[in-house]
Design a protein with these regions (language model features):
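ER/Golgi luminal nucleotide-sugar-dependent glycosyltransferases, focusing on the catalytic module
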Residues: 1-188
Length: 188
């Protein structure tokens, strides 16, 4: 199993956990990490929020095997990763608790598991959809009556894609993972 982290917070507890982990990881970031950064990384344009970063990983870094996709404002234990590595579904949204899953509508881009079979199909179908707007590198604005909901467009399109897959794919699942804690915009 491989890990793909996206973000630019470079959360120190997560870095320490991944340095000690047996699971290989790639950090997809939109700015260069600190000079002493001990992990493999790929930097690219800041477009598409997490789905843009996940697509960059899928198109340029992923070779084969299942992957855990995570925001970098996350804490996760090796026991949690071991449990995730035993998953037999093709795709699952990962949550710390049932209450966390309910609060997020049972879907989010902060943490998910994807099988090799699923990622192969997704890559064949063109990869993760993401909105390039606004594509000027500026922070994505808050949703208002005059500004589109950039923050939720990716997950809405992703869920529609999951629902379009043949029944042979076990997707759109929820997994409760003790030892996982996801943050929000750099805050845990």
């Amino acid at each position: 199993m491989n890990l793909c982290l996206c973000g630019w917070y470079f959360h120190p507890p997560l870095i320490a956990a991944l340095v000690a982990s047996k699971y290989p990881s790639v950090w997809v970031c939109h700015r260069e990490p600190p000079k002493t950064f001990p992990l493999r990384y790929a930097s690219g344009p800041n477009v598409g929020l997490e789905f843009g970063a996940y697509d960059q990983y899928l198109q340029h870094e992923w070779k084969a095997g299942p992957v855990v996709l995570l925001h970098d404002d996350t804490e996760i234990t090796e026991d949690a990763l071991d449990a995730i590595s035993q998953m037999t579904v093709d795709q699952a949204f990962l949550f710390a608790s049932a209450a966390d899953a309910e609060a997020n509508g049972k879907a989010h881009g902060r943490a998910m598991f994807c099988s090799d079979k699923f990622l192969t199909r997704l890559k064949t179908d063109g990869g993760f959809w993401y909105s390039e707007d606004p594509c000027d590198g500026k922070p994505i604005p808050a949703t208002t009556a005059n500004v589109p909901d950039y923050h939720n467009a990716g997950i809405q399109v992703f869920r529609a894609y999951l629902e379009s897959l043949p029944k042979e794919f076990t997707v759109n699942r929820v997994a409760i993972v003790p030892g996982l804690r996801t943050g929000y915009r750099g805050r845990l």
